[in-house]
């Protein structure tokens, strides 16, 4: 008897992995990237991504914003928006290496920011709520701009592509963290786009 869709339970469809040091030992992203290779067939190339924790020890007290831009005009608008709401400690292009499997990359920038006590007092919300609201405002109101990571001492790295290629693209072998997670998408009814790759992160 041939079973039709919906008549058999498929417990999972994507590729996922995690590497965690319970002792807090640092490890490069190379191991988590390698762990995704045997699961290549569990993705279809429409989205792959990683999250690393403990990767920014020198900026551990600041929120690390990873942002995609459609163009430099979008970046100019967003940077003014950020300057009005945060102290920007550092702003830089996100490092990457060109790989033939990853194409059509948006502009990728990274900012380390601190909240301003005067604005926290004025809005009467705590630091985390303030950052979350600001990120959501950017992602819903600033066209051509998408904040895809905004936590402290952690970062998300994602793209349209297979996860093992995404890891090479973002040079994860050059980062060290105590915890890594990875995801390979297998979307069946949605298009692949850079912001829609997993994982998703807010704080």
Each model region followed by its residue ranges:
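N-terminal segments that mediate ammonia production and transfer
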Residues: 1-203
């Amino acid at each position: 008897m041939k079973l039709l869709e919906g008549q058999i339970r498929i417990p999972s469809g994507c590729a996922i992995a995690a590497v965690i040091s319970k002792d807090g030992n640092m490890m490069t992203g190379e191991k988590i990237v390698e762990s995704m290779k045997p699961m290549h067939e569990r993705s279809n190339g429409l989205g792959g991504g990683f999250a690393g924790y403990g990767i920014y020890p020198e900026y551990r007290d600041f929120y690390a914003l990873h942002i995609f831009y459609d163009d430099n005009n979008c970046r100019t608008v967003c940077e003014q928006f950020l300057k009005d709401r945060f102290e920007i400690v550092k702003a830089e292009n996100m490092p990457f290496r060109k790989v033939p499997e990853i194409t059509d990359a948006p502009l990728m920038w990274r900012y380390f920011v601190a909240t301003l006590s005067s604005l926290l007092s004025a809005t009467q919300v705590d630091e985390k709520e303030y950052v979350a609201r600001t990120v959501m405002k950017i992602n819903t109101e600033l066209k051509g701009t998408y904040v895809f990571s905004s936590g402290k001492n952690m970062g998300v790295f994602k793209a349209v592509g297979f996860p093992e290629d995404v890891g090479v693209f973002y040079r994860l072998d050059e980062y060290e963290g105590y915890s890594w997670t990875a995801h390979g998408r297998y979307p069946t009814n949605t298009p692949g786009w850079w912001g829609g790759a997993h994982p998703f992160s807010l704080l």
